[in-house]
Swiss-Prot record:
It is found in: Cytoplasm. This is Pyruvoyl-dependent arginine decarboxylase AaxB. Its cofactor is pyruvate. Part of the AaxABC system, catalyzes the decarboxylation of L-arginine. The arginine uptake by the bacterium in the macrophage may be a virulence factor against the host innate immune response. Thermostable. Retains 48% activity at 50 degrees Celsius, and 13% activity at 100 degrees Celsius. One of its GO terms (cellular component) is cytoplasm. It comes from Chlamydia pneumoniae (Chlamydophila pneumoniae). Inhibited by argininamide. GO terms for molecular function: arginine decarboxylase activity. Belongs to the pyruvoyl-dependent arginine decarboxylase family. The record marks T52, S53 as: Cleavage (non-hydrolytic).
C-alpha cells in the first residue's frame, strides 16, 4: 500500500552547552563538548538527523519545551532536528558562542496559514557575553533571515516570529553551543498521483 510523504505534527525546542579541556583532532570541540551539549539539551540518546527549514502548518501551536515531552523519548531512536550548533577553541580567540533558531509562519491571500520556516543563527564572540547580548543578537539576525524567507516567496507574515536562543562563555579549552527543534510525531500526506 502506497503512502505519501511524512511530515511532523509535534516539535520541541531545546538547547545545550558543553565544554572540555580534552578533545580529539581535527575538531576537538566536536568530541566531548558536543556530547555534553546534547546531554544538557536532553537529546543525547537519539541518533540525530538534520533537517533544513520548512515547517508544515500542523506544527503551528505544537512546538513545546523539551521538558514537557522528555518522558516519551526512546533510547536509540532517530530524531530529526533543525539545529543551530557550533563549537570553538579558546585558542582561536573565541570566548563565547551564541546560537538561536527563529520561526516564521506565512499566510496566503485569504489570510489562511500556509506553513512555516525556520532560520538558524550562530555567532562567535571575542569576549564573554550575557543572556541579553545573546538574545539581542539572535533576534536581530534571525528577524532579518526570517523576513528574507517570507519575501523570497512573496508570502505575508501570518503571526509573530518565535525565537529560541542559547549561549556559552567558554572557560575551558573547547566549547560547544546548540539550539534545536526536534520532531516527534508524524503523519503522512496523501500518496502522490501522476497524471
Amino acid at each position: 500500500m502506497a503512502y505519501g510523504t511524512r511530515y511532523p505534527t509535534l516539535a520541541f525546542h531545546t538547547g545545550g552547552i558543553g565544554e572540555s579541556d580534552d578533545g580529539m583532532p581535527p575538531q576537538p570541540f566536536e568530541t566531548f563538548c558536543y556530547d555534553s551539549a546534547l546531554l544538557q539539551a536532553k537529546i543525547e540518546n537519539f541518533n540525530i538527523v538534520p533537517y533544513t527549514s520548512v515547517l508544515p502548518k500542523e506544527l503551528f501551536g505544537n512546538i513545546v519545551p523539551v521538558d514537557t515531552c522528555v518522558k516519551s523519548f526512546k533510547h536509540g531512536a532517530v530524531l530529526e532536528v533543525i539545529m543551530a550548533g557550533r563549537g570553538a577553541a579558546l585558542s582561536d580567540g573565541t570566548h563565547a558562542i551564541a546560537t538561536g533558531i527563529g520561526i516564521c509562519w506565512g499566510k496566503d491571500k485569504n489570510g489562511e496559514l500556509i506553513g512555516g520556516w525556520a532560520a538558524e543563527y550562530v555567532e562567535f564572540f571575542p569576549t564573554w557575553i550575557n543572556d541579553e547580548i545573546a538574545e539581542t543578537h539572535a533576534k536581530m539576525w534571525l528577524k532579518k533571515s526570517l523576513q528574507h524567507e517570507l519575501d523570497l516567496r512573496s508570502i505575508a507574515k501570518h503571526s509573530e516570529f518565535q525565537f529560541f536562543h542559547n549561549y556559552i562563555n567558554i572557560k575551558q579549552k573547547f566549547g560547544f553551543c546548540l539550539t534545536a527543534l526536534g520532531f516527534l510525531n508524524f503523519e503522512n500526506a496523501e500518496p502522490a498521483k501522476v497524471n
